[in-house]
Amino acid sequence: MKKQTKIAAALSAAAFMMMVSGLPVYAASYGWVTEGDAKVYYDEDGYLTTDAWRKRGEDWFYLGEDGQIVKSKKIDEYYVDDEGKMVTNAWVELKNEEDPDSPETPDTFWYYFEKDGKSAVSKWVKFDSKWYYFDESGHMATGKTEIDGATYYLGTEKDGFMRTGWIRLEENSHAP
């Protein structure tokens, strides 16, 4: 009986070892990790960080719902470039995804992302000695525009800076 118990115990131990040896063992690590072709971030508790900003070196990156770095996308009032870095102190032209089929809206909108990475919103910005206005959506305003009760001419969709003095405008093709 003792011999059978020893054999059963040995077989059980061998079976247990075989089952356990197939399980992967992970080293405790946190911070930036490369998984395949993607960079991801694990917090101090070992959880994958999702839907959050994390800094690497001097640059900020946004991690999407899958934990991977988001690239070439506007995220709330910020924008990340094709490497996933938050854009700062830069102009960015983005495709109109708000109402792309409307003939009254442009195909693209211009944004200016300031030093903190946020897009300029409802404010004037001086850039290269020229003044630009950005509306409540962060779009560069163009054409004849009323701002705080005053009327301004802010150029075309491609240049958008405030004009002063006399301006000769092309005839409006929609005028009767």
Which sequence ranges carry the predicted segments?
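Extracellular adhesion/carbohydrate-binding repeat motifs centered on closely spaced tryptophans
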Residues: K2-P176
